[in-house]
Curated annotation (Swiss-Prot):
The lineage of its organism: Eukaryota, Viridiplantae, Streptophyta, Embryophyta, Tracheophyta. Residues 1-2 form a propeptide. This is Ribulose bisphosphate carboxylase large chain. It catalyses: 2 (2R)-3-phosphoglycerate + 2 H(+) = D-ribulose 1,5-bisphosphate + CO2 + H2O; D-ribulose 1,5-bisphosphate + O2 = 2-phosphoglycolate + (2R)-3-phosphoglycerate + 2 H(+). It comes from Taxodium distichum. Its cofactor is Mg(2+). One of its GO terms (cellular component) is chloroplast.
């Protein structure tokens, strides 16, 4: 017998394939405060027991592979392996269950959302033993979240920078999103800001196309910002989209924005990638720029109920990677979002400590230990009649963003902005007086139309516009 064979035998190596559950299903395991916890919705192939499927998820997203390998004897699997510690049936779903998996902290690089996702969701979703797999939630322990900078500034610092308190902020996405020249684009920005909005915005796919190169757009938008500020006495901003084909180009655009003296830039964090986003967030903190985040591509990942990843996980990842705003659905507009589920991840974005609440889809108590919060952005198919509901649902710490609901005003861009600002001020005043916006919202808007012909015209245009499709984002 060779020395190598003797060594393998001495550590108990036995080649072959064994069930995952023998190693990775540990219902007796007591989770640690430092563990990263995951809740997976698992749909196994017919004939695969839940314990085996849950253990396979834990194995393939941590230390496991399809066969026994002799190098297992060179490390401590018990220290590094993921563990499926609980299986929870789903009422009314015979073929699905929730598998809870605990991962030891040492499996993950500090301060890297990229490494976190590569480990937990990078490979296991293509596993043949599973028909479908969805990551519903993650618990990020303080020991790990403290390795991240998080948002460049956070909610309170942003309000202090803007000197705006006691109400939601108002925004507008410039439309048409593609095709305008830089000068005409800047004109629309000026008209909206002059009319009373706090922000205007590049759409997610406005980067640097032949009809409008990024440098020209940045310059004309900066001119619009300064002109509107001088005329209104308010601090204004435009989300200048720095997203680019390379990280170097992205940083060049952010640096140019800072040199122009504008307050905020923007990034598409999913298409741009977490590594690029974290780099940009660090630059923004160091240089006093706010960072608006668009979630373009999120529905490819999060819209299916049984496969992919819920947006609450993407929201937590963004808070760690860094962003001061992120789009979060509207509940009442044209884009997906069920009320309680939406408010669940809105709280995960804004609050320091969020209790477990399965009625809102929150599987774990989350303690952010003073990491700055992120402002949720409500955007997509909303107009002045939605203002009471949006004010009541999202509260003051939010951005309400009306694209077509501003630029579609029959009198033009500036009157559209005036209508939205008047509607917002009326709703905030009514709420502060103790009125119930959920019940009296339409009456509040009608009363305000007496003092604002711009609002009256907007109410007439959009009085019958509704998006009455059922949401598929349900618990």
């Amino acid at each position: 017998m060779s020395p190598q064979t003797e060594t393998k035998a001495s550590v108990g190596f036995k080649a072959g394939v064994k069930d995952y559950r023998l190693t990775y299903y540990t219902p007796e395991y007591q989770t640690k405060d430092t563990d990263i916890l995951a809740a997976f919705r698992v749909t196994p192939q017919p004939g695969v027991p839940p314990e085996e499927a849950g253990a396979a998820v834990a194995a393939e997203s941590s230390t496991g592979t399809w066969t026994t390998v002799w190098t297992d004897g060179l490390t401590s699997l018990d220290r590094y392996k993921g563990r499926c510690y609980d299986i929870e049936p789903l009422p009314g779903e015979e073929s699905q269950f929730i598998a809870y998996v605990a991962y030891p902290l040492d499996l993950f690089e500090e301060g890297s959302v990229t490494n976190l996702f590569t480990s937990i969701v990078g490979n296991v979703f293509g596993f043949k033993a599973l028909r479908a797999l969805r990551l519903e939630d993650l618990r990020i322990p303080p020991a790990y979240s403290k390795t991240f900078q998080g948002p460049p500034h956070g909610i309170q610092v942003e309000r202090d920078k803007l000197n705006k308190y006691g109400r939601p902020l108002l925004g507008c996405t410039i439309k048409p999103k593609l095709g305008l020249s830089a000068k005409n684009y800047g004109r629309a920005v000026y008209e909206c800001l002059r009319g009373g909005l706090d922000f205007t915005k590049d759409d997610e796919n406005v980067n640097s196309q032949p009809f409008m190169r990024w440098r020209d757009r940045f310059c004309f938008c900066a001119e619009a910002i300064y002109k509107a500020q001088a005329e209104t006495g308010e601090i204004k901003g435009h989300y200048l989209n720095a997203t680019a084909g390379t990280c170097e180009e992205m940083m060049k655009r952010a640096i140019f924005a800072r040199e122009l003296g504008v307050p905020i830039v923007m990034h598409d964090y999913l298409t741009g990638g977490f590594t690029a986003n974290t780099s940009l967030a660090h630059y923004c903190r160091d240089n006093g720029l706010l960072l608006h985040i668009h979630r373009a591509m999120h529905a490819v990942i999060d819209r299916q109920r049984i496969h992919g990843m819920h947006f609450r996980v993407l929201a937590k990842a963004l808070r760690m990677s860094g962003g001061d705003h992120i789009h979060a659905g509207t509940v009442v507009g044209k884009l997906e979002g069920e009320r309680e589920v939406t408010l669940g991840f809105v709280d995960l974005l804004r609050d320091d400590f969020i209790e477990k609440d399965r009625s809102r889809g929150i599987y774990f108590t989350q303690d952010w230990v003073s990491m700055p919060g992120v402002l949720p952005v409500a955007s997509g198919g909303i107009h002045v009649w939605h203002m009471p509901a949006l004010t009541e649902i999202f509260g003051d710490d939010s951005v309400l963003q009306f694209g077509g609901g501003t630029l579609g005003h029959p009198w033009g861009n500036a009157p559209g902005a005036v209508a939205n600002r008047v509607a917002l001020e009326a709703c905030v005043q009514a709420r502060n007086e103790g009125r119930d916006l959920a019940r009296e919202g339409n009456e509040v808007i009608r009363e305000a139309t007496k003092w604002s012909p711009e609002l009256a015209a907007a109410c007439e245009v959009w009085k019958e516009i509704k998006f009455e499709f059922d949401t598929i984002d349900r618990l």
